[in-house]
Structures are given as C-alpha cells and as structure tokens.
Design a protein with these regions (language model features):
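Substrate-binding cleft/loops of secretory-pathway carbohydrate-active enzymes
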Residues: 152-183, 188-230, 236, 301-307, ...
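Aromatic-lined substrate-binding rim segments of carbohydrate-active enzymes
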Residues: 35-102, 176
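N-terminal carbohydrate-binding accessory modules
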Residues: 1-49, 79, 741
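Aromatic- and acidic-residue-enriched segments that line the glycan-binding/catalytic groove
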Residues: 64-72, 94-121, 125, 129-135, ...
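Aromatic-lined ligand-binding clefts that engage carbohydrates, nucleic acids, or primary amines
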Residues: 653-675, 705-706
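The substrate-binding groove and active-site-proximal loops of carbohydrate-active enzymes
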Residues: 20-32, 55-74, 110-129, 150-165, ...
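Carbohydrate-binding surfaces of carbohydrate-active enzymes
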Residues: 112, 124-136, 143-145, 154, ...
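Glycoside hydrolase catalytic-domain groove-lining segments
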Residues: 196-266, 280, 320-322, 326, ...
Length: 745
C-alpha cells in the first residue's frame, strides 16, 4: 500500500521524494459527458493531480436544496479520476473565490446576518451540513490526495492573527470529524493568509487582471529567481498583500495557484502566451519549488443558475466583472477542451519532473554569485524585476550535482541580450564550464551538471535541457544550441538524443507504454484499448513517430498495426551513442485539407459550406449541399450588432465521435452566442479568434451572434488593440468551421 508523507523539503511517497504536477479543473464548469475525455487529456499532458473547488453556490443555490447531479455530480467525477489513476486535491471551502458569485457563497447565506468565515456557531452549523453532503459524494472513492481548507483566508476576507488561526483549526477539525481523510491538508499561504497548522501552498500569476490599473503593469517579479515565495499581488483587489504569516523555511515550497493563464476581466485584458507561463514555471523550479500546481489548467463555462447567473460581478459587490459564462482562463486546456501550446510547453516540465523529480526535490537553490561570466553578474537574491539588463541565473544542487537555470524572459518587456556568455559552476572537482553562447531576449532553460547516466558514466555537463529517459538507456534532451557534452567515461549502452524545443513540445509520454516516446504535433491520448490522435483540419500533420527501447519493446506488434520503420533516423533527432539500441517507427495520418471558411462583411450575406468526404472537410463552392449561412440582422436603434448563423450538416457526419469548432474572429467589446433565445456562450475581446464547440450544443442549425461595440476611450486595458473606425469597433472579421476527429493508432 502506498504511503504518503511530507518533510520540510517535499512530498514523499513510500519515504521517497516525489515531484507531482497538479492542474485545476472545475467539474461543475464542464458538462458531465465530457469529463472522462478531459481527464484523459490532462493525464496525457502530464498532470498527476486534478485540483477542484466544490462551490457551495453550485450545489445549494436554494437553501436546503442540494444538487449533486449532472455536471455537479462530484462522486462520478471522482470515480472517473480514480479510473484514470488521477489523484484529486479537493478544495472544499467553504469560501472559494474562483471568480464565482459571492466567492462561492449562496445568496441566501449572505442574507442570514451571521458572521461568515468565523467561529459563529450558526455559520459553522451550515458549513457542517454542506460538508456532510460533500462527504457523502467522497465516500467510496480512493483518489483524494489532498484537501484544501478555505482560500486566501486572512488575506481576502476572514480574520487575521490568533482569531484567524483558530478558525482555520476549527474548520480542519470539523472536516476530519465528519470523516474526510487525506494524506495532505493545505491552505493558501500568500498575502498574509493564516494557516491554522495546515501546510501552505503558494501561487503566482504572469499578470493581474484584477488590478485596478488600466496601463501595462510594471515587470512581474515572478520572472525572477528569488527566495521570496509570496506573490502579494494575488487578490490585491480585495486587500493589499502582506508578509507571510509563517516561517517559509519550515515547509516545502509547494504551489497550487501558478497561473496556467489568467481570467480576463472587463476592465483589464491580458493576452497570455505559452512562453509567459513556461518562463515563469522555470523560475519557480530554479527557486526551489517542488510541486507545480496550475490554476487554471483546464478552462470551463459557468453552469446555469436557478436564481441568478453564477459569475463574479460588481453587481454583487465584487471588484471585477468577468464573462457571465466563459471561464476559459486562457488555460493550457481551453474551455471547450482544446489543448493549447501552453499545455505542450508545460509538458516539457512534467516529463522532467516525472523522471528526475526524486533527486531534483533534494536539490536546493544557490544563487549565482561567481558562477557566470557575463556583462552583468548578480551576487545575491534577485529582487528588482525592472532591471532588464541583469543576467538572471541560479543553480539548484545537492553537493556537486545539479542544474544551472537561466531566465532572460520578462513578460511584456525586452531583456538585454548577453553575447558570448560562458556559464560556469564551481564544484569540489573544479570548475565546470559550458560552451559560450548568446543568451537572447526571451531565452529560458536549465542545464544539468554532473548528471548521472549510470553507475559508470556521468555527464560532467551538457548544453541541453533534460526531457526524460527510457529505462535509463535512452536519454532525451532539447535545446536550440547544437548538442555538446563532456562525459567522464565513454558512453556504454547509453544513447543521448537531442532535438530542438519545438520537437520536444511534440513529445508525448503514455503511462501505458513506459518504454516508448511518441512524437506528434497533434495531441495523443490513451484510450482503454490503445491510443488515439486528436486531428484538426486547421493543423495538418502527415505522420506520428515513436522511439522505443529496442531491447525491451517488440516493434513487430506496432508494425503489424500499420507503423513503418524508416530507412534512417529522422532528421529532427541528433543521436550520440549506440543507435542500435533504439527503434524508430512512423505512422501516416489521414490528411486534413483546408477547413471550411466563410468570409463576409457587415452588409453581405455569405454562405459557409460544410462538405465531408472520407472524414475530412474540404473548402467548396456554393452548391445545393450542406451550408452554413451567415447574415446580418438590422441593428437600427440597438446597442449591439447581431448576425444569424444557419448551419446544416452532412448526413454521414458521426456526431458521437467528431466535433466542429466555430471560429469567430471579431473586434468588439464582447461577443455572445444564443441558441433558441438562450445565451450559451460569451467572450470578451482580447485579440484571439474565439472558438466554440458545436458538439457541446448538439450541433445547432441556427445561432444568433451578438457583438457589443467597443469605444476607443472606454476604461479598458487591452494588450492587443483592435482596429477602431472613428473611435469605435464592432465588427465580425471572419467566421470559419474547423473539423476535429480522432484517429486510432
């Protein structure tokens, strides 16, 4: 039986350090029929733990009327996580935040007049009743690894000091008395929040859409290597951040709210990239973090309320307005399950953590000092994010082994380029020097030194970042420099395989196939009986590759299922060592031609043709078969512009297995989609093409698109500006249909 514990450095499994990856996914913000596939996606992207809130208002919107059915069915969600061997970190509140109405408190609770978030007996009685309902959902499941009590308590509301500590202890005791059990019990620790004897988890975001500023924010400190774990800017719309209420050195550095993206607000709309999240994550790794936990990892859509909408808004006392429905969060997996470039970026770190986490967890950060030859060398803890010329570097090591981290990325700002940098590390056996290289703006990476390949072979250095290994024989690295290394002995049965960063992001590791590394620009998921590729008509790819350990894996099984052995190793791989120990196979994918497109202006009526042949959509001229019409509705006297979208589908279309995404390229304040008079989707403009799953809504044949005008002088911070005409914009630039299907491998 697995035994989980904790020490002052890391989480432990059977007395060995572990470095898990955790991603937030709110089950009640996703339709129940989609849960299993979305769990499989998170597993494929390298997540080990799914964190989720249990929003009180989602389950008891009306006092005494509990709802744990449909997309609120917590028990079924937990059983699916269990099925796919995913742990769960349950955030039971009672207060949550999560951009939910009242922070997750039902309206009726606020009207009671009780002293909420305190030891008020009347309040605690209602908490106990709610938690007992949650516990009934938890009973019979075996996947809960951690439980978080409250959220941002003593920082965003709640009591401070001794009274706050006492309340957190009261809640923890209540939960355990009810019957909740978990190896780990946590509380958010940033901003001066109190713990009540719980383990603190930290956070950090690349931007602050809750900030009142309507300008670009100063350089973010989350892009520094630093001993500072506290991001006091989180929740600064409620209260200014304060110093930590605990001794950070007494606890491992664990995160639960590294922003996988950010949720845009009406007044502030950052546009997040994969590199924004990747560079921030590398800085946390270098600074000593031993659990990367992302909020959000999977976006969602707010459920429909019985009495009101369920989003945070200024109308109910919040400081920000967010979309009524969309909780996309620009997350690694988007609100309709689209796997983004951010997910692929973070997958680089999950593969590293899974294969090297045990030793990495016991390595401590040591700041650069004299370990670098550069135009500017830092000699201590990094504090000034506004210094864009400083060379940011740190080593994380145990004795003479470790990793050298470099970050020359600062979201929204240009860092100075550093020419001919020789990275150096001091060890007991002398200085380790890496080949000179230019560190350009936007670069971030980490290199190993004294990297153990076997009992006999150590890489003294290599100018590549470790990705993963297979059976400690095939060692995969990536980087944009040509691979160079120094080993203390000749490679014996060891193979070093390097690739550039793009191909590394195409790597997929399946728990079902531990001796194989898959390569595909398209997502690869495990199924109950094998694997499948998620193909899209706008992301063409000719083939997939696998690399396996030829000494333990039988290639014949794969060849019998359509995989082919190429004559030479593909040119995206650079191999050092005995290549006979590796087997490379490729598989041709069904070609995906151009997606269906409809381009139109405000006054034109255009047809969007959807035609299907051999499971693929093609662009087609206007004919008598399947079409989607888009036409403008008279907007005279209205403060919005509307369009009717009429769609018909090919009869051969397999709705059970395939999907169509409606891509809407608009420039306006916000867009809304209506089906049969009911709003089903919405989005604030940030500069991205908006994607909506038509399968989610049972492939509707008619939709209404509504756009609201954006004025150039509106009090809104836009990172990406639209095209204004006479100080105004409210236009539909383009609309397309993208076909998605799965191919079994």
């Amino acid at each position: 039986m697995e035994k989980y514990s904790i020490n002052g450095v890391s989480l432990l499994k059977n007395e060995k350090a572990i470095f898990p990856m955790m991603g937030e996914f709110h089950f009640s913000r996703c339709p129940e029929p989609e849960w299993e596939e979305e769990i499989r996606k998170m597993r494929a992207c390298g997540m080990d733990i799914i964190a989720t809130y249990v929003f009180w208002i989602h389950h008891e919107e009306e006092e005494g009327v509990f709802d744990f059915t449909g997309q609120r069915n917590l028990h079924y969600f937990l059983k699916l996580c269990e099925k796919w061997q995913m742990h769960v970190w349950l955030r039971i509140g009672p207060w949550a935040h999560g951009e939910a109405r009242n922070g997750g408190f039902p309206d009726w609770l606020l009207k009671k007049g009780y002293k909420l978030r305190s030891d008020d007996p009347d309040y605690l009685a209602l908490v106990e009743r709610f938690w007992k309902k949650i516990y009934k959902e938890v009973e019979g499941t075996h996947c809960i690894l951690g439980i978080q009590i409250e959220n941002e308590y003593g920082h965003v509301g709640g009591l401070r000091g001794a009274a706050g500590e006492q309340h957190m202890c009261t809640l923890t005791k209540l939960a355990k008395t009810i019957g909740f059990e978990a190896p780990y019990w946590t509380a958010t620790g940033w901003g001066g929040a109190v713990l009540g004897d719980l383990t603190p988890v930290m956070g950090g975001y690349c931007d602050a859409p809750w900030d009142a500023s309507l300008k670009q924010l100063p350089p973010n400190k989350n892009y520094l290597f630093s001993t500072v774990r506290n991001d006091g800017n989180i929740g600064s719309d409620y209260a200014p951040g304060m110093e930590l209420s605990f001794d950070k050195d007494a606890y491992p550095y664990l995160t639960a709210e590294l922003g996988g993206g950010v949720q845009v607000t009406h007044h502030r709309r950052p546009r997040v990239t994969a590199e924004d999240i990747g560079a921030m994550s590398v800085c946390k790794l270098g600074s000593g973090c031993n659990l990367l936990g992302y909020y959000m990892y999977h976006g969602g859509i707010n459920p429909k309320g019985k009495l009101s909408s369920l989003q945070e808004s200024t109308a109910v006392g919040s400081f920000c307005d967010v979309p009524e429905l969309s909780y996309d969060f620009q997350a690694p997996i988007r609100e309709y399950g689209q796997i983004s470039e951010t997910a692929k970026e973070l997958k680089l770190l999950s593969m590293f953590a899974h294969d090297y986490g045990e030793t990495f967890c016991n390595m401590q950060p040591q700041f650069a000092g004299d370990d670098c030859e550069s135009t500017s060398v830092h000699t201590g803890d990094f504090q000034d994010a506004e210094d864009l010329s400083e060379f940011r570097m740190i080593t994380r090591r145990s004795g003479d082994r470790g990793y050298l981290f470099v970050n020359n990325y600062q979201r929204g700002y240009e860092m100075a380029e550093h020419k001919d940098v020789m990275l150096r590390v001091q060890t007991a056996d002398g200085e380790i020097s890496f080949p000179k290289q230019d560190i350009k703006n936007g670069a971030y990476f980490f290199y190993p030194f004294n990297f153990l390949l076997s009992d006999d072979v150590t890489l003294r250095w290599i100018n590549q970042t470790p990705l993963c290994n297979i059976n400690r024989k095939l060692w995969f690295f990536y980087g944009n420099e040509k691979m160079q290394y120094e080993a203390d002995e000749k490679l014996s049965g060891q193979v070093l395989i390097s690739m550039d960063r793009i191909w590394a992001k195409y790597a997929w590791r399946m728990k079902k196939y531990p001796n194989i590394l898959f390569f595909s620009a398209l997502p690869i998921l495990e199924t109950e009986n094998g694997i499948e590729v998620i193909c899209r008509s706008d992301r063409a790819q000719k083939n997939c590759w696998i690399i396996m350990d030829a000494t333990v894996e039988d290639a014949k099984t794969w060849i019998d299922n359509g995989w082919k052995k190429p004559d030479i190793i593909p040119d995206f791989l650079h191999v050092e060592g005995d290549a006979s120990t590796i087997c490379v196979l490729s598989h041709d994918l069904t070609a995906a031609d151009n997606q269906t497109v409809a381009s139109f202006t405000h006054t034109d009526v255009n047809n969007c043709i959807i035609r299907k042949e051999k499971n693929v959509f093609h662009r087609a001229e206007k004919t008598d078969f399947s079409e989607a019409e888009v036409c403008a509705i008279d907007d005279t006297g209205k403060d919005y512009q509307e369009y009717v979208i009429r769609i018909s589908y090919d009869k051969a279309y397999d709705a059970a297995k395939e999907n169509i995404f409606l891509q809407i390229d608009f420039q306006a304040d916000q867009a809304e989609l209506y089906l049969n008079g009911e709003k089903i989707a919405d989005q604030y403009y940030i500069g991205d093409v908006w994607e909506v799953s038509l399968k989610r809504f049972d492939f509707p044949t008619e939709l209404i698109l509504r756009l609201y005008p954006l004025e150039e002088d509106d009090k809104i911070y836009l990172e990406t500006q639209p095209d204004y005409v006479n100080g105004r914009c409210c236009s539909l630039k383009d609309i397309r249909c993208v076909y998605e299907y799965k191919e079994k491998l």
